[in-house]
């Protein structure tokens, strides 16, 4: 059986890690052992933050909807309850966009929510 020298494979593996570490500061960008740890940690942060991003955006949308709903005389929870009773199925992302960029449309939705609560 022939002897296998792994120089080519090792070089490719090192190059892959160092390419992923491009743009890092200090030894993290050009020392394989340090770069490998930095890339692994970056992967962990990326994995965690892909999940966190969803939570953070939902919280942002809720804060924006709450602010706009209070301008219309409703709290967030009462506004959302009114939407549910009025059978208006608009998600929080769209409501937040309306609250920021189209206040008259949001005000109309808020009026419908208020009307459904009075019944």
From Swiss-Prot:
Name of the encoding gene: rplT
Protein name (database record): Large ribosomal subunit protein bL20
PANTHER family: 39S RIBOSOMAL PROTEIN L20
GO cellular component, one term: ribosome
Listed transmembrane segments: none
Record-level Gene Ontology MF annotations: rRNA binding; structural constituent of ribosome
Keyword list, A-Z: Ribonucleoprotein, Ribosomal protein, RNA-binding, rRNA-binding
GO biological process, one term: translation
Role played: Binds directly to 23S ribosomal RNA and is necessary for the in vitro assembly process of the 50S ribosomal subunit. It is not involved in the protein synthesizing functions of that subunit.
Family in the record: Belongs to the bacterial ribosomal protein bL20 family.
């Amino acid at each position: 059986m022939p002897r296998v020298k792994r120089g080519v494979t090792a070089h490719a593996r090192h190059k892959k890690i160092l390419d992923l570490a491009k743009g890092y500061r200090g030894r993290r960008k050009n020392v394989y052992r340090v770069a490998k740890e930095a890339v692994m940690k970056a992967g962990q942060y990326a994995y965690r933050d892909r999940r966190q991003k969803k939570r953070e955006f939902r919280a942002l949308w809720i804060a924006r909807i709450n602010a706009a709903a209070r301008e219309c005389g409703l709290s967030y929870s009462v506004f959302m309850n009114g939407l549910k009773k009025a059978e208006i199925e608009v998600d929080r992302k769209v409501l937040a966009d309306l609250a920021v960029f189209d206040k008259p449309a949001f005000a109309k939705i808020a009026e419908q929510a208020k009307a459904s609560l009075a019944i």
